[in-house]
Amino acid sequence: MYVLLTKRLARSLWRTKIRLVAVLLIIMVGVFSGIAFGHYAHTASTMYDEIYADTEDGINLPDIWVENPGAVWNGNQADSWCEHISTQWPESELVLNECEARLILDGMLLIEEDEEESKLIPAIWHGIDEGYIDRVWMPEDDCCSGRLAVADDEIVLDAHIADEMEIAIGDTISIGAGQGIMDYTIVGIGFHSNHLYFATPGSILPAEAGTFATGYLSSTGLERLANLSSGSANRLLIDLVGSPDYDLLSTDEVEGVELAELIISIRSSIESVNSTAIVYDRSGVS
């Protein structure tokens, strides 16, 4: 029965050669697309593992983030939160290595299009001193060069925006955060883990040229720009000893059971002192 049906199908397709060719082409495209995507996924996974690693060439991606979405802690508050998390650490096989405060603010980049007109581009500015966690990535490549921002009027510009807008080291740009706009000298070109996929927040599409910017100042540089006190922060970056598993949203299993339990404990500890901060691991990073 099956043999007869197969023969009839073959005769029918042979009578319509164009349809047969189309079917074969669709099958071939599907097979080659699957192979190509599998190779890309493997390559991308390996590349990101190397970037995120706690090595000399990596950036040491945090294991846990504590984010204050509605406000900014002053320096004393940020330090006390790290101390609170350390002293309230639960019994766990996961060991705290570092807790670093970080300031990240929405802002703008001012571009002079001609002598009479200027353009404001939405931006995100990071206050990053040379810490231990989530460092600026500046590989030895044509894409990147220079050094980290040290002075409070220096900035490392993201390589995506530098390449798109033909901005180079030594150039001066005008940026804002809050109510002020100030000039900063570009001393480096690099990348950051938050913006390896360069898109505006909330969008799944890559940002078009001239529509979004990111840059990495010193902590004092961003505090100066936003008129904030020394040590201000709205993120806590927590690094654990080793590389614990974390839950993958693409599966139904809970891969990082110990990390999930630790996050619940940290969240409960923070909520006990009436904080609105949110706590998440790498699975919660978009």
Predicted regions and their residues:
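Membrane transport/envelope proteins' first extracytoplasmic loop
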Residues: 2-286
